[in-house]
Amino acid sequence: MLGGKQIVLTRMRTGQSGTVVQIQGGHGLVNRLSALGVRPGKRITKVSSMLMRGPVTIQVDRAQVAIGFGMANRVVVELD
């Protein structure tokens, strides 16, 4: 990557974009997120998030995907 700032998905602001660099979890989590299109190298945009550790909605390719806070907290993103 180009050395941009890396943060977890839950800390991104709404509208921010970046590239997934790592998923911090076991094979089950990696496979579940991969099935949703979230994998290292993919560019994502945070669309929204709910208060109190609610789901996080992201744009991946042309689809919007909602994932739980715990899952989103394990996705490391390099900001654009």
Model-predicted regions and their roles:
Residues M1-D80:
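Compact, glycine-rich, soluble single-domain proteins
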